Amino acid sequence: MAPKKTTKKGGPKKRPSAEKRILTAQKRNLINQSFKSKAKTMMKKFEAALKAGDQTSISSGLQLVYSVADKAVKRGVFKSNKAARIKARATLRANAKV
């Protein structure tokens, strides 16, 4: 492990704000990517439930899609219009199967 950089007074060396913003953006990007992947997985599970035709799995899958889409908006991963589109399409597909 590399030695820690310190200032003349012995405290930790301060990072320029641009460098810090790059690091935080990279961290957020990883978190957002994992959440997007989770959302896609839930949508695929919902599609599988639609193909199976089981009513209970369709309704629970639809609830999961709604939940994940709303959480993504709350976290800032999706814009609200994208979540609305996802939920509307899922509802249309679920109603078509009923």
Curated annotation (Swiss-Prot):
Region Disordered, residue ranges: 1-21
GO cellular component: cytosol; small ribosomal subunit
Stretches with biased composition (Basic residues): 1-15
SUPFAM superfamilies per UniProt: Ribosomal protein S20 (SSF46992)
Keywords from the UniProt entry: Ribonucleoprotein, Ribosomal protein, RNA-binding, rRNA-binding
Molecular function terms, GO-annotated: small ribosomal subunit rRNA binding; structural constituent of ribosome
Biological processes, Gene Ontology terms: translation
Family: Belongs to the bacterial ribosomal protein bS20 family.
Cited HAMAP family: Ribosomal_bS20
Entries under NCBIfam families matching the protein: S20
Function: Binds directly to 16S ribosomal RNA.
Protein name (Swiss-Prot/TrEMBL): Small ribosomal subunit protein bS20
